[in-house]
């Protein structure tokens, strides 16, 4: 009673297929994949932008440990 058998999962799968249809499920998965891809791209853009902002503009002369 506490765990799901294979019959429970087959019934759930049948209901999902009836609700969404065969053609709609791949379309939904494609949209989810595009969303994840755009999210990762956005996170990568934020890291690049934050790395550029952390530079304070000072240069170090390697010959004489002097900061200009």
From Swiss-Prot:
GO molecular function: protein transmembrane transporter activity
Database matches in PANTHER family: SEC-INDEPENDENT PROTEIN TRANSLOCASE PROTEIN TATA
Name of this protein: Sec-independent protein translocase protein TatA
Keywords: Cell inner membrane, Cell membrane, Membrane, Protein transport, Translocation, Transmembrane, Transmembrane helix, Transport
InterPro entries per the UniProt record, alphabetical: TatA/B/E, TatA/E
Entry keyword Metal-binding: no
Transmembrane segments: 1-21
Family classification: Belongs to the TatA/E family.
Topology in membrane: Single-pass membrane protein
Pfam families the record matches: TatA_B_E (PF02416)
Main location per the UniProt record: membrane
One Gene Ontology biological process: protein transport by the Tat complex
Compartments in which it is found: Cell inner membrane
Subunit structure: The Tat system comprises two distinct complexes: a TatABC complex, containing multiple copies of TatA, TatB and TatC subunits, and a separate TatA complex, containing only TatA subunits. Substrates initially bind to the TatABC complex, which probably triggers association of the separate TatA complex to form the active translocon.
Residue span of region Disordered: 42-68
Function summary: Part of the twin-arginine translocation (Tat) system that transports large folded proteins containing a characteristic twin-arginine motif in their signal peptide across membranes. TatA could form the protein-conducting channel of the Tat system.
Organism: Rhizobium meliloti (strain 1021) (Ensifer meliloti)
Bias (Basic and acidic residues) ranges: 53-68
GO CC annotation: TAT protein transport complex
Gene3D superfamilies for this protein: 1.20.5.3310
């Amino acid at each position: 009673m506490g765990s799901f058998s294979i019959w429970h999962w087959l019934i759930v799968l049948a209901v999902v297929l009836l609700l969404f249809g065969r053609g709609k499920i791949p379309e939904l998965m494609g949209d989810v994949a595009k969303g994840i891809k755009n999210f990762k791209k956005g996170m990568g853009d934020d890291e690049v932008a934050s790395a550029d902002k952390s530079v304070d503009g000072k240069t170090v002369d390697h010959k004489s440990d002097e900061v200009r």
